[in-house]
A protein has these predicted regions:
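Short amphipathic beta-strand/extended segments with alternating polar/hydrophobic composition
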Residues: 25-31, 35, 121-130, 169-172
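Charged, amphipathic alpha-helical segments
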Residues: 76-100
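Mixed-charge, glycine-accented linear interaction segment located at domain edges/termini
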Residues: 129-195
Length: 195
């Protein structure tokens, strides 16, 4: 029977700070995990143009520059929200002084998904420009068991380094012998081009 690797889960989100993203090099630090990921939605950022010559369609040009991304979490601790750029956290008082804007924060976005066959898949989007962190709408508990999620928004982009892929996907061998290496891959710092 053929292997079934349709994705059925989403967990293990980790963000690695992008330390360098230039036309000559790409480098990240080690990734830091964020628990309780709920869902991720992506919408392609694309433009297209049809070129007509001699009253006929000559070419259709299409450019996909990335994805608008929204990730929902059950919670993110206040100190971790501060590390992501939402504000300043005072550990002594347990207070986060925050603003509505998160600017200038770029990470590699990594996550793990489950599959029908039970063998996970590991994703690494190399450039995730964080554009927002906010709490979802609040609702009374009466008749509702919903959670006020923390919503992280941003854009997946291509690295500036020529030839560097926008993302990488890894899946362990069927026998799972390299599962530890896959888990380490999600957390590790990355440098391109490879030495």
């Amino acid at each position: 029977m053929a292997k079934k690797s349709a994705i059925i889960g989403f967990k293990g989100v980790a963000l690695a700070p992008v330390l360098q993203d230039t036309i000559t090099a790409y480098e990240t630090g080690e990734a830091v995990g964020i628990q309780y990921a709920g869902s991720m939605t992506r919408t392609p950022k694309e433009s297209s143009q049809e070129l007509y010559y001699d009253d006929d369609l000559y070419a259709q040009l299409r450019e996909v520059s990335g994805d608008d991304v929204e990730v929902r979490f059950a919670e993110i601790p206040l100190d971790q929200l501060a590390q992501l750029g939402l504000g300043r956290y005072d550990g002594e008082t347990g207070t986060l002084e925050a603003d509505f804007n998160v600017t200038g924060r770029t990470y590699a976005f990594r996550c793990v998904t489950g599959t029908v066959d039970g063998l996970p898949m590991f994703f690494n989007w190399r450039v995730f420009e964080l554009t927002g962190l906010r709490f979802d709408n609040f609702a009374t508990r009466s008749g509702s068991l919903s959670v006020c999620e923390v919503i992280m928004s941003g854009v997946f982009k291509r690295p500036k380094l020529a030839g560097a892929a926008a993302y990488a996907i890894r899946q362990p061998k069927d026998d799972g012998t390299d599962l530890a290496a896959c888990n380490a891959w999600i957390a590790a710092a990355e440098t391109l081009p490879k030495a």
